[in-house]
Amino acid sequence: MSCSYYGKCAGCNLNLPYNDEISFKTDFLKSEFKEFYQGEIEIFKSDEWNFRNHAEFGIWHEKGDVFYTMRGNSNERVKIETCPKMDKKIVEMMPKLLQNLRENKNLKERLFGIEFIATKFDFMAILLYHKDIFNIKDDLAKLAEILDIKISARSRGKFLNFGGEILREKVQNFIYRFNADAFFQSNTKVNEKMILFVLNAVKNGKDLLEMYCGHGNFTLPLASEFGKILANEISKNSIKNARENSKNKDNINFVRMSAKELIDAFNGVREFNRLKDIDITDFDFSHVLVDPPRAGIEPEVLDFIQNFKNIIYISCNPASLKQNLQILCETHKITKFALFDQFVHTEHIECGVVLQK
C-alpha cells in the first residue's frame, strides 16, 4: 500500500493488493450470507486512490504550530500531511489551508478539527473550534477570499458561512444540492454504480415507495422508471434539498416523516397534515426501496415492506443486513446481491440486495 502512514494511522486496516482486497470482501459476503443466497455477487469496484470527497481530520497543537492528525492504531494521534485516499482537490488544498492557519494566530487558536468536502462544483472547509467564532469573523472571511473556497466555522452550536452553505454535486446527469451537514455518499464514482444497480433492478415499475430517501440520491434517476414516487425522510434539511433537486420532476412526492409515521398513515392509525395534499391510496406500488442507517430497518418497517412484491435494499452494514434478511427471506427470495466498494483499504462493505416474492 503506497501510503507512508499505513500501520500508524487507523484510517485504513487492509494492506492488500486491490484484487486481493476485493476477493477478501467477496469471500466474506459469500460466507456470511450463504444461508440466504448462493448465486454470483456483482462487484462494483472503486478507484484505489483519490476516491473520497469528504473527510474530517483532527488538529494537533505543538509549540505554537499546528498539524493535521488521524487517530492511530493505539488511539494515539498520528501527525499527517495529506491522505492519498482523498479527492485530488482535497490533497491540493490541505497544505495551502494549513499554511494560512499557521500564519494567523486567531485562526489556529483553539482549532480542533477540519472537515473537507470536494464536489465537481464546490469546495468547502469546515473549521471546528472551542471558542467564540464571531470574534474571528473577519479572519475567516479573508481566508475564504484568499483560498477562493467556501469556509464554514462551527463552535458550540453556532456557525458562520462564507461563500454560501449549499454544496452542489453532479451524479450522472443530475445536479444535487445539499447542506454540508447532510448525509451524502463520499465516493461519487461508486455512488453512480449504485444508482445503475438500482435502475437495472427495476422491471415493470408501476409506482415506487422509497424510505430513508435523503436528498434524493436514488429518487431523481428512478423518476423515469416509475409512474409516481412517494419518498420519506425525517431530516428537514434533506427534504428541503430533495424538493429543490426534483423541482423539474412532477411525479415525485417527498414527505418529511419517519418510517413509522408513514406506516401509521398507510394503516389509517393517524392522519397527518403533511400528507393533506397527497392521496396515498392513489399509488399502485410495485417496488419499495430502502436505504436505512447502519442500525438497519426497524421491526415494524420490516413487517410493512414484506407486503411489497419487489424490495431493493441498500445497506451500509452487513451485520444489520443479515439480521433484517432473517425476516425478509421468510417471504422473499434474493435475486441479486451486490458489493459496492465505497471504502477501499478498509473492511467496510456496502451491499445492494434485490428481493422478490
UniProtKB/Swiss-Prot annotation:
The keyword Hydrolase does not apply. It is an enzyme of class 2 (transferase). Pfam families: tRNA_U5-meth_tr. S-adenosyl-L-methionine binds at Q185, Y212, N217, E233, D291. Keywords: Methyltransferase, S-adenosyl-L-methionine, Transferase, tRNA processing. The active site is at C316 (nucleophile), E350 (proton acceptor). GO terms for molecular function: rRNA binding; tRNA (uracil(54)-C5)-methyltransferase activity, S-adenosyl methionine-dependent; tRNA binding. It catalyses: uridine(54) in tRNA + S-adenosyl-L-methionine = 5-methyluridine(54) in tRNA + S-adenosyl-L-homocysteine + H(+); uridine(341) in tmRNA + S-adenosyl-L-methionine = 5-methyluridine(341) in tmRNA + S-adenosyl-L-homocysteine + H(+). Belongs to the class I-like SAM-binding methyltransferase superfamily. RNA M5U methyltransferase family. TrmA subfamily. Dual-specificity methyltransferase that catalyzes the formation of 5-methyluridine at position 54 (m5U54) in all tRNAs, and that of position 341 (m5U341) in tmRNA (transfer-mRNA). HAMAP family: RNA_methyltr_TrmA. This is tRNA/tmRNA (uracil-C(5))-methyltransferase. It comes from Campylobacter hominis (strain ATCC BAA-381 / DSM 21671 / CCUG 45161 / LMG 19568 / NCTC 13146 / CH001A). The gene is trmA.
